[in-house]
């Protein structure tokens, strides 16, 4: 168990100063360097005389200087707001307007001119590092102080800043490094793929820094080159893979992504979206000896609230994989529309309680009051997810409350339709989306389909292919759930966080 994230890093700077904490295609930085650099940057930040505990926006990619700046800000008592280099200018502006940061640190060239807020460039960070200033930690982030603030996409399009405290982070990190499901080894060798602006990144950097491991990052230029990306990943000595399931699906398009080519890769950690039976089955075929851990949880409950190791028996017997045993310190409940706790096996909304629950959305009391509350004397959060608990306290996922539609008199869960279509042996990936009429009632249901290699060539017309796919799933799919139109694509759009971008597809079919 760790009691302070920075204390842990400082300890490794003493005991394994020359061990790499960061590796980008062979460009390495050690724990000793991280301490020296973060001390110097923290001293520089203190010299700016910012308002105590005010948040600082940090703009960039998955570079070492981003990591060193995060550590420096924690030392100097400031929460950091990570904003990815690929973020749209409109989103960056919205984050600034909501967060009102006292400073912007631009590790990459900043795309906006902001009046009234000082901007520190990479050259100034480099100069601060060269100064090698000593630093005494007298006002570091601790307890209920905000450690980081991650902005999620709000349903209205307005981002919401989730405040995660040092205590929240410790609750998550200690569970992850001690829980048998994750089985995190000492000095873990972690692939650092999800951007820092996505809280799934915490699942790789927190246990790595807590256990003295190495983060294997990828330059932003490489991430944009699909073929080269997965050729390079196959050459990295990573032992643990952390990503969304969608990113693993992309990786499996490369023949190099297999146990024979990547023998060091023994653990897969998934979170951020649903892990399908199809993806898990394919992974077991590619990596027969690997452990697949399925985690679940919203950003508002600090990355994940449950986890479970997926077995081959689960893949054979479940249509939707279980999402885990809840964290011991985070009692998780299923409630009905009236807020009443439901019994085992009954489906309702998943709510999470305990020390990992955020204090709320930054500068947004209205949205905070809607989502955060007290349940059984503990801080609690409405996940907006449908689920149930088995008698063995295993959490089962039933979809999103806001992805439920009413169609032809039936209440339909879009993710359930997608799951059923993904069961077809011809389908590589499928997403169901509604088309609305002028009264915003569902007019019909459509499906975006990516078929497996070689499938299209077996059919003369798409109509015949559609009939074949429908026939392959009709025995386990209710007729009213079957989409009326299938749209075939070579790939489906992904969000910057690597999830299938369902909202973009919904907007596309509705000409928004």
Curated annotation (Swiss-Prot):
Cross-referenced CDD domains: DltA
PANTHER family: ENZYME, PUTATIVE (JCVI)-RELATED, PTHR45398
Pathway: Cell wall biogenesis; lipoteichoic acid biosynthesis
Sites where the protein binds D-alanine: 199, 303, 499
Enzyme Commission number(s) of this protein: 6.2.1.54
Similarity field: Belongs to the ATP-dependent AMP-binding enzyme family. DltA subfamily.
Catalysis: reaction(s): holo-[D-alanyl-carrier protein] + D-alanine + ATP = D-alanyl-[D-alanyl-carrier protein] + AMP + diphosphate
Keyword Ligase attributed: yes
Residues binding ATP, per UniProt: 152-153, 294-299, 385, 397-400, 499
Enzyme's top EC category: ligase
Highest taxon of source: Bacteria
GO molecular function: ATP binding; D-alanine [D-alanyl carrier protein] ligase activity
Gene (name only): dltA
Any one Gene Ontology BP term: lipoteichoic acid biosynthetic process
Keywords carried by this UniProt record: ATP-binding, Cytoplasm, Ligase, Nucleotide-binding
Localization (cell): Cytoplasm
Pfam families registered for this protein in UniProt: AMP-binding (PF00501), AMP-binding_C (PF13193)
Gene Ontology CC: cytoplasm
Job description of the protein: Catalyzes the first step in the D-alanylation of lipoteichoic acid (LTA), the activation of D-alanine and its transfer onto the D-alanyl carrier protein (Dcp) DltC. In an ATP-dependent two-step reaction, forms a high energy D-alanyl-AMP intermediate, followed by transfer of the D-alanyl residue as a thiol ester to the phosphopantheinyl prosthetic group of the Dcp. D-alanylation of LTA plays an important role in modulating the properties of the cell wall in Gram-positive bacteria, influencing the net charge of the cell wall.
Name of this protein: D-alanine--D-alanyl carrier protein ligase
Keyword Nucleus attributed: no
């Amino acid at each position: 168990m760790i009691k302070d994230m920075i204390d842990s890093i400082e300890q490794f700077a003493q005991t394994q100063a020359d061990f790499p904490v960061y590796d980008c295609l062979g460009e390495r930085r050690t724990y000793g360097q991280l301490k020296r650099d973060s001390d110097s940057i923290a001293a520089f930040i203190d010299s700016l005389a910012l308002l105590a505990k005010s948040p600082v926006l940090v703009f960039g990619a998955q570079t070492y200087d981003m990591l060193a700046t995060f550590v420096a800000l924690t030392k100097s008592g400031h929460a950091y707001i990570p904003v990815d280099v690929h973020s749209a200018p409109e989103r960056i502006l919205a984050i600034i307007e909501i967060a009102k940061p006292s400073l912007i640190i631009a590790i990459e060239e900043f795309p906006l001119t902001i009046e009234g807020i000082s901007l520190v460039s990479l050259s100034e960070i480099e100069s601060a590092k060269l100064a090698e200033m000593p630093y005494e930690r007298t006002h570091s982030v601790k307890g209920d102080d905000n450690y980081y603030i991650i902005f999620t996409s709000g349903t209205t399009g307005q981002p919401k800043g989730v405040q995660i405290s040092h205590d929240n982070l410790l609750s998550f990190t200690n569970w992850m490094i001690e829980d048998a499901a994750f089985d995190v080894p000492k000095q873990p060798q972690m692939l650092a793929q999800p951007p820092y602006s996505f809280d799934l990144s915490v699942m790789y950097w927190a246990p790595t820094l807590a256990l003295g491991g190495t983060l294997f990052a990828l330059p932003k230029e490489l991430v944009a080159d699909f073929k080269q990306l997965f050729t390079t990943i196959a050459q990295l000595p990573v032992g643990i893979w952390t990503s969304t399931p969608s990113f693993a699906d992309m990786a499996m398009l490369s023949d190099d992504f297999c146990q024979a080519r990547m023998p060091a890769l023994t653990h897969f950690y998934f979170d951020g979206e649903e892990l399908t039976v199809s993806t898990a089955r394919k992974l077991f075929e590619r990596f027969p000896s690997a452990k697949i851990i399925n985690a679940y949880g919203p950003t508002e409950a600090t990355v994940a609230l449950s986890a479970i190791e997926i077995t081959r028996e689960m893949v054979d017997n479940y249509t939707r994989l279980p999402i885990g045993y809840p964290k011991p310190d985070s009692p998780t409940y299923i409630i009905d529309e009236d807020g009443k706790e439901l019994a085992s096996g009954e489906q309702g909304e998943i709510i999470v309680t305990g020390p990992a629950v955020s204090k709320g959305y930054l500068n947004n009391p209205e949205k905070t009051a809607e989502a955060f509350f007290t349940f059984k004397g503990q801080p609690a959060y409405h996940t907006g997810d449908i689920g149930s608990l088995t008698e063995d306290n295993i959490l089962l996922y039933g979809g999103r409350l806001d992805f439920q539609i009413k169609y032809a008199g039936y209440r339909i869960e879009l993710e359930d339709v997608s799951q059923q279509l993904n069961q077809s042996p011809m389908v590589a990936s499928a997403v169901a989306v509604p088309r609305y009429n002028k009264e915003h009632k569902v007019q019909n249901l459509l499906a975006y389909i990516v078929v497996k290699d070689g499938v299209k060539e077996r059919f003369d017309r798409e109509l015949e292919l559609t009939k074949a796919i429908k026939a392959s799933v009709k025995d386990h799919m209710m007729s009213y759930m079957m989409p009326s139109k299938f749209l075939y694509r070579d790939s489906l759009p992904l969000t910057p966080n690597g999830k299938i971008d369902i909202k973009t597809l919904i907007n596309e079919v509705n000409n928004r």
